[in-house]
């Protein structure tokens, strides 16, 4: 894998957009599901996947994308890079959250709750 040289300036929009797309792929979240999570249209997420749209740092989609990546990273740290287990956790009923995380993260409030839940679980290990 090529490494960026110290003088290479990475575009934060491309970095976050790529991280969001990779996390959604590993968690097997559809483009329409990702659109709901980010508050975007399915066609905008399709353009993201095609590389013709990047998340806008001035819009809410940026914050939601950053939260989604944080959710993925927290879940990855807790489960140990076991993608099938992460998908299972995301799709299973969770008593602590009173719902399935995959359903909850489709709203801003639910996404924040799931991230806080994972953060608190990480704090215990």
Language model regions located:
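Non-transmembrane "mature" sequence context
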Residues: 1-125
């Amino acid at each position: 894998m090529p490494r960026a040289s110290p003088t290479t300036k990475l575009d934060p929009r491309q970095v976050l957009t790529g991280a969001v797309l990779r996390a959604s792929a590993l968690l097997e979240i559809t483009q329409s599901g990702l659109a709901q999570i980010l508050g975007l249209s399915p066609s905008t997420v399709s353009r993201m996947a095609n590389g013709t749209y990047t998340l806008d740092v001035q819009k809410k989609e940026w914050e939601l994308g950053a939260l989604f990546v944080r959710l993925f990273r927290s879940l990855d740290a807790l489960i140990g890079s076991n993608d099938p287990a992460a998908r299972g956790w995301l799709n299973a009923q969770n008593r602590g959250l009173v719902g399935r995380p995959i359903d909850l993260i489709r709203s801003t409030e639910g996404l924040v709750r799931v991230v806080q839940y994972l953060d608190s679980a990480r704090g215990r290990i």
